[in-house]
């Protein structure tokens, strides 16, 4: 589903007249989507053909649409807000929704075990995905625009596969190489100057 973010950003960007799309970007997009499909399906076309969808996929589609719209609107940001101010707003809104859920879970006896591992994971999540990743994403959109930035999302399945190989000792297979080649070629092509 993440592979749908770059095309959605390109569509929103075109509709809002934020960025023009060129043939290199469209070609790179197709190559990278093919690469993502190769990795997530283990190069087995039957896995793609037999995909089925459920309620969770609808929520994921809503997430894809919101992230794409957010990313496109970042370029159009005419507010005098810094990247850290935007992050602070997002954290505040997130807390408004998550604190009641946390309190509810506490009230029904679902206790969080606060130990060293929990604290280390929390610190990691706060620093890297919550602050550093958002800051870098906002900066990338500011510098190269939403269309070109969005192509780098296609690296997520590649990095997930690499982490599985390193951490879980999964075997590096031909489909990893083929998928990586298409993803990297697509990103390179879509970021070429016309």
Language-model features: locations:
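Hydrophobic alpha-helical transmembrane segments of multi-pass membrane transport proteins
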Residues: 11-12, 38, 58-73, 99-148, ...
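Hydrophobic residues within alpha-helical transmembrane segments
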Residues: 4, 26-33, 58, 62, ...
């Amino acid at each position: 589903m993440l592979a749908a973010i770059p095309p959605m950003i390109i569509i929103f960007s075109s509709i809002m007249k934020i960025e023009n799309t060129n043939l290199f970007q469209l070609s790179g997009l197709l190559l990278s989507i093919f690469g993502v499909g190769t990795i997530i399906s283990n190069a087995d076309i039957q896995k793609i053909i037999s995909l089925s969808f459920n309620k969770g996929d609808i929520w994921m589609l809503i997430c894809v649409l919101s992230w794409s719209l957010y990313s496109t609107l970042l370029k159009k940001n005419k507010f005098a807000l810094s990247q850290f101010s935007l992050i602070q707003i997002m954290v505040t809104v997130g807390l408004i929704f998550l604190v009641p859920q946390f309190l509810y879970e506490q009230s029904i006896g679902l206790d969080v075990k606060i130990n060293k591992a929990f604290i280390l994971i929390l610190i990691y999540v706060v620093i890297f995905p919550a602050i550093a990743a958002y800051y870098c994403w906002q900066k990338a959109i500011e510098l190269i625009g939403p269309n070109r930035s969005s192509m780098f999302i296609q690296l997520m399945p590649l990095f997930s596969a690499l982490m599985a190989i390193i951490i879980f000792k999964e075997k590096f297979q031909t489909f990893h190489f083929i998928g990586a080649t298409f993803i990297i070629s697509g990103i390179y092509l879509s970021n070429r100057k016309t």
